[in-house]
């Protein structure tokens, strides 16, 4: 059996260049970065720092736990949780200024009834 070992190297300067280029093309829109699952295994905090340095302020993660990890590092970024209202403690979104993505009508209705506890949400 053949053993296939792969190595992925990411140049953070190139990542920054690509973000600036894409952000420039979207001049009237918000350009965001999806850094879920440890930035796809690249190291979420390293990738976050690199993109934040070039003015990326909107980040998508999969889980509330990932959002909290980033929030500890930087208080001014907009952090969106793709898994929606997964947390049993919905006040965590408001307390840490994390924005859940609402994935279905059930979550939308829940937020309408509990917006004071949640803060903001993205549909």
Functional labels for PLM-detected ranges:
Residues 2, 6-10, 14-17, 29-120:
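Active-site-proximal beta-alpha core segment in soluble small-molecule metabolic enzymes
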Residues 25:
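Conserved PLP-enzyme active-site core in the AAT-like
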């Amino acid at each position: 059996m053949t053993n296939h070992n792969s190595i992925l190297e990411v140049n953070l300067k190139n990542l920054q260049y690509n973000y600036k280029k894409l952000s420039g093309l979207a001049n009237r829109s918000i350009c965001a970065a999806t850094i879920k699952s440890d930035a796809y295994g690249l190291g979420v905090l390293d990738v976050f720092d690199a993109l934040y340095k070039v003015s990326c302020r909107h980040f998508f993660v999969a889980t509330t736990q990932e959002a909290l990890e980033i929030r500890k590092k930087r208080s001014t970024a907009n952090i969106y949780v793709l898994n929606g209202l997964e947390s049993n403690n919905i006040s965590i979104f408001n307390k840490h200024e994390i924005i859940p993505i609402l994935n279905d009508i059930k979550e939308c209705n829940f937020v309408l009834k509990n917006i004071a506890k949640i803060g903001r949400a993205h549909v």
